[in-house]
Amino acid sequence: MASSSSNRQFSHRNVNTFLTYPHCPENPEIVCQMIWELVGRWTPKYIICAQEAHKDGDMHLHALLQTEKPVRITDSRFFDIEGFHPNIQSAKSVNKVRDYILKEPLAVFERGTFIPRKSSFQGNPSKGNSEKKPSKDEIMREIISHSTSKLEYLSMIRKEFPYDWATKLQYFEYSANKLFPEIQEEFISPHPPSSPDLLCNESIKDWLQPNIFQVSPESYMLLQPTCYTLEDAISDLEWMDKLSSQQMKEQESRASTSSVQQELGNLLGPEA
């Protein structure tokens, strides 16, 4: 139960994903190809995977994944490869993450073209006005691509567009809720299953017949002041049951006989 609860609370959304597979001796090329296929819907652009060894000889893998669209998952087991479960993080500084992966690799595999992160949304002020400033749309695109949570998204907007943040906060909050929706927890009924199961139709019928549709001897005694014992009540109820059954059979017999006579009359036609 604890594992399912933690899995429901997990959420990852980013175009840059940093994965670490501990105790994993798998080939980096095989792992890269499998991850590439897993994220096909988000249009992968680049992946690098490096194998490293601890001092005790234990192998582990590091991988950096870059996609055109943000990878959006709520299943913490999504990136599991051959039973190996990774630590999943958002790579806020892809340049540093890539350098870290390449520090002491035993084996490396790359696919695609690495996309370095821009040093600043507003450009480099030391270069004066010679470098064109990014447009508002470009800055927002960077914020949407690199923010990893609702709080970080709003904080980045506040930093880059303080006036817009102060005057149009409700619109930014709306977009934040769309980008990072709340994870709905699975409903767990506070009431344990009943025994017998009340959803079982057969059990309900078995209970209805003697308790609702039939008169109990005790109820009959309450309704009949002249009935003093339980045996008398049972005897009266049995007699009434037999009598009503007999009367129903007689009615059915008369109805069937009348139906046959009507059919014969229709066949013979009216008398002359």
Curated annotation (Swiss-Prot):
GO cellular component: host cell cytoplasm; host cell nucleus
Cofactor: Mg(2+); Mn(2+)
GO molecular function, one term: metal ion binding
Basic and acidic residues composition bias: residue spans: 129-138
Region described as Disordered: spans on this chain: 119-138, 245-272
Motif range (RCR-1): 18-21
GO annotation, biological process: DNA replication; symbiont-mediated perturbation of host cell cycle G1/S transition checkpoint
UniProt keyword list: Activator, Covalent protein-DNA linkage, DNA replication, DNA-binding, Endonuclease, G1/S host cell cycle checkpoint dysregulation by virus, Host cytoplasm, Host nucleus, Host-virus interaction, Hydrolase, Metal-binding, Modulation of host cell cycle by virus, Nuclease, Nucleotide-binding, Nucleotidyltransferase, Repressor, Transferase
Ranges of compositional bias, category Polar residues: 119-128, 245-264
Record-annotated active site: 100
Pfam families assigned to the protein according to its UniProt record, in alphabetical order: Gemini_AL1, Gemini_AL1_M
Motif RCR-2: positions: 60-62
Chain positions covered by the region annotation Oligomerization: 175-187
Known function: Implicated in enhancement of V-sense gene expression. Acts a an inhibitor of C-sense gene transcription.
Name of the featured protein: Replication-associated protein A
Native source species: Maize streak virus genotype B (isolate Tas)
